[in-house]
Amino acid sequence: IECVEEMIDKYPEELFKNPELKILDPCCGMGNFHLVIYKRLLNYHNKKHILENMLHFNDINKDRLNILRKVFQADKYKLNITEQDFLTYDEGIKYELIVNNPPYAKLLPNGKRASKNHNLIGVFIEKTLKILKEGGHMIYITPDNWMSYADRNKLIKVLTEKQILHLNIHTAKKYFKKVGSSFTWYVIENKPYYKDIEVEGIWK
């Protein structure tokens, strides 16, 4: 949760005031991102409006969604919950904000993750940009390999052509001490690059 709070702090506060804001977490798990966002939204909107109109949840894990329903009181509020593969997700909505800690490799029929050669980050970001409003924002945490200038890496071009408002390099490692990967997280505005990037941390 501390890592999520740090990330959400970089989202422009005034945008939380918009009552028409629609926020999607496409791999919501048990709702860590939306727990933090919900608390911020309570400064400006009532609970019913937030839960029934502003927050949108999606995941492919039924058990996690059942826990999420209890956390966000699905017995009292009509939550926006879908159980879909995000890559084929289509609710006919353009979102102002999409937050995500995406899976790094495809889930195989045996329940295991595929090798790193089946990295899903690129296709998740491509999908995100398709359903993100122009001028909307995405907040992602991913391994740092998207920053490589390797010939096959097209993701660095896709992301740097957009306006990265904040890029955090490797400092999130303190929250994932038992995980081998090095992480970046970033806040991106869905507009062409127009100003300098705020960078925190060091690329090694």
Model-found features: residue ranges?
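Conserved proline-anchored active-site loop of SAM-dependent methyltransferases
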Residues: I23-Y38, N61, Q84-R113, G122-I131, ...
